Every structure is written in structure tokens, then in C-alpha cells.
Design a protein with these regions (language model features):
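Hydrophobic alpha-helical connector segments
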Residues: 69, 76-121
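Amphipathic alpha-helical packing segments from all-alpha helical-bundle domains
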Residues: 129-154, 165-166
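Short hydrophobic clusters on alpha-helical segments that form packing/core surfaces
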Residues: 24-32, 78, 95, 135
């Protein structure tokens, strides 16, 4: 026999679940910052919230998935920023302005983003292959959503037009390239958003360089609003 649940009761249950989920995320990042990602166990995260490991796994499949909650919020905000860019902007310029503005918001703590948590994620991506791998996997899974928004901006059907797919792929590549450049010390800046801005600038300028041609790196820009 099916059972029903009164709206107020269901509402309380959902709020309790949300509070537990947020408490697990807060505890996880606190431990990640104190001990490091690899040294932190699921059991320790659960103990911080006074729940069992089994309860943790009701909300997250792994420690890596906790990290992805922040990236999911960041990605959603970037899609919204991309959709709101002026229609007159070329696709790569719109992608650049949307991505860089959201990254700077994460770094500066605006729009509700936690800059310390963002910095913690950057450190974990550098030190943990598991976190870096899951981040790349997350980006690949979200590429279809970027493609859809780009196609809507262009007024084309992505089923028959490959340009939205190429632009979305370049966007993902820009994030990966920026991280690799920053990690290797190629760039003199310590801000991820500035390196990402430069990478998008290179993409906008084109990559058909002659072997002996020396061209300056694009300057960092401030996205227009």
C-alpha cells in the first residue's frame, strides 16, 4: 500500500536532509584544509557531524564528490553568466567573459562564493590526482550543457552544426590549460582567473603560429558587465 506524507512533514524532512548535507560539506572542507585531502577519511568527516559513514554515503559517493558540489555551483553560475552575455558578443568572447568573471567572483568572495573553499579546491587539484581526475570528468560531462547554451546563442541546431561543440570543447580545454600553466609556473601571476583570461585570449587570437614567430601573450582583461 502506498503511503503519503503531509507537506509540512515532508518539508521538515527535506530541510533536515539539506542541513545534514551542508554540515558534511563544511566538515569535509574544514578537514581538507587542516589535514589535506588524501589524509582525510570519510569516517572522520562523518564523525565531525556525528553521523555514520553509511549516512555520508547516502549523500555522496566519495570524498571527491564533496569537492564537486562547489564546482557544480560554479558551473551553474557560469552557464547563467554565459546566457546573459550580450547577443552581439562573439561566442569565444562571451565564453571568456563569463568564465573569467565567475572565476574572479570565486577568488574575491563575491556572489556568495567562499574564497577560502575555492583556494582549498585549487590546492587539492594540484596535490591530488583523484580530485584533478574527477574535476576533468565533471567538465566532460557538462560539455553538452555548454554546447546547448552556445547553440541557443548562435541560433543553430547542434545536431547539424559542429561549431557549438567545438566552442564548448575549447572552453573545457581552456580551464585545463590554465590549470596546467598555473601549476607549472609558466605564468607569473598567482590568480587562476588571470591565467584563464590569457588562455582564452590565445584561443581568440588563433593558434596558427609559424615556427619562428614570436608573439606576446594576450593581456589580462576585465570582463564587461
Amino acid at each position: 500500500m502506498e503511503t503519503s506524507c503531509a507537506a509540512p512533514t515532508c518539508g521538515r524532512r527535506e530541510r533536515k536532509k539539506q542541513r545534514t548535507r551542508e554540515a558534511l560539506i563544511d566538515a569535509a572542507f574544514r578537514l581538507f584544509q587542516e589535514k589535506g585531502f588524501e589524509a582525510t577519511t570519510v569516517e572522520e568527516i562523518a564523525d565531525e557531524v556525528d553521523v555514520s559513514s553509511r549516512t555520508f554515503f547516502r549523500y555522496f559517493a566519495s570524498k571527491e564528490d564533496v569537492v564537486l558540489t562547489f564546482q557544480e555551483e560554479q558551473f551553474t553560475t557560469m552557464l547563467e553568466a554565459l546566457a546573459s552575455r550580450p547577443a552581439s558578443e562573439p561566442v569565444m568572447t562571451a565564453l571568456r567573459n563569463a568564465a573569467v568573471s565567475v572565476l574572479r567572483a570565486c577568488e574575491d568572495g563575491t556572489y556568495g562564493f567562499d574564497p577560502e573553499r575555492f583556494g582549498c579546491i585549487q590546492q587539492m587539484m594540484e596535490s591530488s590526482p583523484a580530485v584533478f581526475g574527477r574535476s576533468l570528468e565533471h567538465g566532460q560531462k557538462k560539455q553538452a550543457e555548454i554546447t546547448r547554451v552556445i547553440a541557443e546563442r548562435m541560433g543553430v541546431d547542434p545536431a547539424v552544426d559542429l561549431r557549438p561543440h567545438v566552442a564548448a570543447g575549447l572552453s573545457n580545454s581552456a580551464f585545463r590549460s590554465a590549470f596546467e600553466v598555473l601549476s607549472s609556473g609558466v605564468s607569473g601571476t598567482g590568480r587562476f582567473s588571470d591565467v584563464l583570461d590569457q588562455v582564452f585570449g590565445v584561443m581568440e587570437d588563433g593558434l596558427n603560429y609559424l615556427p619562428a614567430e614570436q608573439t606576446p601573450m594576450p593581456e589580462t582583461t576585465t570582463p564587461s558587465r
